[in-house]
Amino acid sequence: MEVNILAFSATALLILFPTALLLILYVKTVSQNN
């Protein structure tokens, strides 16, 4: 089964971008509380 690179990368970006934003916001709030 051939994997569609465009579909795979698009899905990966859709998953990674919101996760990265949430991690950055979480780290910022945690560092501010300390």
Swiss-Prot record:
Q: Does the keyword Membrane apply?
A: yes
Compartments annotated for it: namely: Plastid membrane
Q: Which domain of life is it from?
A: Eukaryota
Membrane-crossing residues?
A: 5-25
Membrane topology, record value: Single-pass membrane protein
One GO location term (cellular component): photosystem II
Q: What keywords are annotated for this sequence in UniProt?
A: Membrane, Photosynthesis, Photosystem II, Plastid, Reaction center, Transmembrane, Transmembrane helix
Q: What is this protein called?
A: Photosystem II reaction center protein M
Which organism does this sequence originate in?
Cuscuta gronovii (Common dodder)
